From Swiss-Prot:
GO terms for biological process: tRNA splicing, via endonucleolytic cleavage and ligation. It comes from the Archaea. The keyword Lipid metabolism does not apply. This is Protein archease. HAMAP family: Archease_arch. Keywords: Calcium, Metal-binding, tRNA processing. Activates the tRNA-splicing ligase complex by facilitating the enzymatic turnover of catalytic subunit RtcB. Acts by promoting the guanylylation of RtcB, a key intermediate step in tRNA ligation. Can also alter the NTP specificity of RtcB such that ATP, dGTP or ITP is used efficiently. It comes from Sulfurisphaera tokodaii (strain DSM 16993 / JCM 10545 / NBRC 100140 / 7) (Sulfolobus tokodaii). The lineage of its organism: Archaea, Thermoproteota, Thermoprotei, Sulfolobales, Sulfolobaceae. Belongs to the archease family. PANTHER family: ARCHEASE (PTHR12682), PROTEIN ARCHEASE (PTHR12682:SF11). Ca(2+) binds at D12, D138, I139. GO terms for molecular function: calcium ion binding. It holds the Pfam family Archease.
Length: 139
């Protein structure tokens, strides 16, 4: 199963992330967002950051997960390439970890900066044996 794909969207970037379960789909969504910004295969998992959030529904958890990671990028210039997510669907909480390193222009390709997560076209689909997360990021 592919981890993610991009789709055309006027002035922004659409992402479809896939996973065998909801946690994996959220992890792959994060990889996709950082792949927009750089080649994540060149981002070493040297430092770890934690994210603990709650939401009012799964879409809000997805929004807040990506938003939290972008805050680390904006405040520390952190790029991430490895993620761990544990979602409690009953209580709508997410505990996640992201591993990466600070942006180094000599090592990391500078692609398009993701400015923000959006709710535009957001959809979380449970297909029985896999999940599809669809969303758009502002660039």
């Amino acid at each position: 199963m592919q981890k993610f794909e991009f789709f055309e969207h006027t002035a922004d970037i659409g992402i479809r992330a896939y996973g065998r379960n909801l946690n994996e789909a959220f992890e792959n969504a994060a990889v996709a967002v950082f792949e927009v910004m750089t080649d994540t295969s060149k981002v070493e998992p040297k430092e770890m950051r934690e994210v603990k959030i709650d939401g009012y529904d799964l879409e809000n958890l997805l929004y807040r997960w990506i938003e939290s990671l972008l805050v680390y990028y904006d405040s520390e210039i952190m790029l991430f390439s490895k993620f761990y997510v544990n979602i409690d669907e009953k209580n709508l909480t997410l505990e996640g970890k992201a591993w990466g390193e600070k942006f180094d222009p000599n090592k990391h390709e500078r692609r398009t900066v993701v400015k923000a997560m959006t709710y535009h076209e957001m959809k979380i689909e449970n297909k029985g044996n896999y999940y599809i997360l669809t969303f758009v990021v502002d660039i």
